Amino acid sequence: MAIIFATSSFGQVKSIDERIGEAMNGSNWAELRSLYMSDGENLQTPFLKPLSKFFISQFYNEPDSAIKYGKEILEKYQDELNSSVPSIMYFMSEDYAILGHYDKASALLHSLNEAYRKGGQTANPVFEAYEDIYSKLSKCGTFSVERPNNNVSVPLLTHTGNRKNPEMMSVMANINGKEVKCNYDSGAGINIMTTKFAEHIKATVIQTKNIQMLGMSYVDSKGLVVVDSLKLGDLVYRNVPFFVVDMRTDNPLANKKLEELGYECVIGNQTMMPLGEICFDFDRMQLVIPASYTPTPTYAPNFYRSPQRLFHLSLTDGRSGRKIDAIVDTGASGTILTNRYYKKNENCFTGRTATDSLRTAGVGGVNVVKTIPVSWTFTLAGEQYTETNIPVVTSSEQNEEYDCRIGLPTLMAHRKFIINFKNMWMRFED
């Protein structure tokens, strides 16, 4: 979904309106926030102020504010937004859903889909699917989290027991009264489980219109499960939605590995964000949910949640000196520099041939890419770190919208890793 805002330049120096318009057109949300915070008072185009506030609220975890500014935009500036109105309404429906107002989320998308039909157009299948999903969720009870006043600690497990090569990180959970192992995955924007897992916990699969989810490739959902309770230590979630998917690939070896890993249930970042802050204490192998927030550092915020529901962390690349986007993925077995990074810095790899192959398996299939091993330095939260051997992907069909994927080995090389969702910042602690 694109937000279209035309810009034109009449001189050498671009106005703040033009720069903000370009940030929106390029989906550069961190740049948009920086521009607006430093120079937003000088905007001349009336609708750019509420539109900027809408996107900043949307991607920096302020759903209440996003709805407020979204309403203002739809009431006053529909003509100016034109073809971008559906995107605004879709994002607002997601905000309503985050707040547990599934009925409002469904109603908003219903009005959008009806407008398409009345205009003789075909409604967007994603909008239709989520209208159906939110409608079904509105009949299943409100999502909530019950937590004690003290810190909560949940043991972390890895498949290998080796911090340098953990392969997968899991937690033991109690779902609908059954003790089960679940992958704890910050790179998953939604919770998912297999049909087999749903049968194991005796959950009813609700039939919904399918959505496509991106893993190794796109895969269709096969319905929805709403679990009555999900317990992590002393935390209790109520009415938790999980999408049902087929984890199998067309590769027998990959399927065998996924079965060995017990890859059947994924707790995604939609269940992490309501906690406000989480700390991965890798020395003690504990997931800690603190009773009070860590004081906000001066560099906050340094990440946002993208339209694809990924955490985009701002790093300074040691090779180029530029800011780059990295996703933080506790479901990833390794760290990579993506093909997008390679294309931006191709001149740095002149004369080097991609001789290594990287094979990864996950939801939707198997992906094999050619890579070049490099040493890489980056700066996060004012501290510099070095990866001595990291693959740079020289070709890819996935068209990633980020430059780096930070996986488990990089994260677990440190004592702790903190993610604060209230003020949207991350950092290592050593």
Where are each of the predicted segments found?
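Bacterial N-terminal signal peptides
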Residues: 1-6
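Pepsin/retropepsin-fold aspartyl endopeptidases
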Residues: 11-430
